[in-house]
């Protein structure tokens, strides 16, 4: 704030010059100090593309973010280019509020940390700041894991923090059999649900059959409408040999499969279904 006025820095592709000017005018009339771009390289200011100028302007814009209380992203039709993506990550790291012209999928913890790595590689943030970013990332990741582990149901439970689902899966089951691009799909979700189904019997075959029966009778409609399903079969003995039988009832679904051993002396089996809508 400066003399009671909020300071807002505009970010986005300079191809949206008209939207920049309209937003600058509107936010100014709402009583804000607005910092915008100085040149529109994608809208006719060709000097931007001469040697050294674009790098200078990119560094300047990070300084403009430092001056602001908030950034406002001009993302017409949801478009966010690489430079803007890095500016969003930088603003988040610096604790700035972030608003968007249009509703869009917000970057994840992992997206922002990767973008900060690009800024560090380009020499635009210091070793010290990147080290701090890494520590912040670890703290937020651990908080997301704690959120995941603290959730007890009742199921299905709608997750407000999709990061919590991903972090929980990674933390509880490791990266084995999970492809990064599969996990990435979770962030495209409108909502993410988890259902946990406990087997009821004293032997593996009957345990898995009771789980399959529950899936078919209670969950197939929602599963059929999902974009992706993450299936984790947990058993007191190695459950990997039972995946084929389980997969028969999910034929045609986009599924990531994984197993986990339960450390218990009792005969037990549980299925986690995380499905993305």
Where are these regions (language model features)?
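Tubulin/FtsZ superfamily GTPase core signature
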Residues: 123, 128, 132-135, 139-277
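Acidic/proline-rich low-complexity IDRs
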Residues: 108, 115-118, 206, 241-242
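Conserved catalytic or regulatory cores that recognize and/or transform ribose-phosphate-containing ligands
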Residues: 1-112, 116, 137-141
């Amino acid at each position: 704030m400066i003399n009671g006025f909020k300071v807002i820095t505009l970010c986005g592709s300079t191809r949206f010059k008209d939207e920049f000017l309209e937003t600058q005018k509107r936010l100014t009339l709402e009583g804000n100090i607005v910092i915008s771009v100085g040149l529109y390289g994608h809208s006719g200011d060709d000097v931007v593309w001469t040697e050294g100028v674009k790098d200078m302007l990119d560094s300047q814009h990070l300084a403009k973010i430092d001056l602001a209380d908030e950034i406002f992203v001009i993302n017409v039709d949801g478009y966010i280019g690489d430079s803007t993506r890095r500016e969003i990550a930088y603003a988040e790291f610096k604790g700035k509020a972030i608003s968007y012209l249009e509703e869009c999928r917000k970057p994840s913890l992992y997206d922002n940390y990767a973008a900060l790595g690009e800024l560090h590689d380009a020499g635009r943030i210091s070793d010290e700041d990147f080290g701090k970013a890494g520590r912040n990332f670890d703290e937020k990741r651990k908080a997301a894991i704690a959120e995941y582990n603290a959730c007890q149901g009742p199921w299905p439970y709608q997750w407000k923090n999709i990061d919590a689902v991903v972090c929980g899966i990674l933390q509880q089951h490791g990266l084995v059999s999970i492809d990064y691009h599969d996990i990435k799909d979770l962030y495209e979700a409108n909502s993410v649900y988890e259902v946990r189904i406990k087997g009821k019997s004293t032997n593996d075959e009957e345990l898995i059959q009771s789980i399959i029966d529950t899936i078919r009778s209670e969950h197939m409609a929602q599963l059929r409408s999902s974009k992706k399903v993450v299936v984790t079969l947990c058993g007191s003995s190695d459950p990997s040999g039972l995946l084929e039988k389980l997969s028969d009832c999910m034929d045609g679904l986009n599924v990531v499969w994984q197993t986990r051993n339960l450390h218990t002396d009792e005969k037990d089996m549980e299925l986690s279904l995380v499905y993305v809508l």
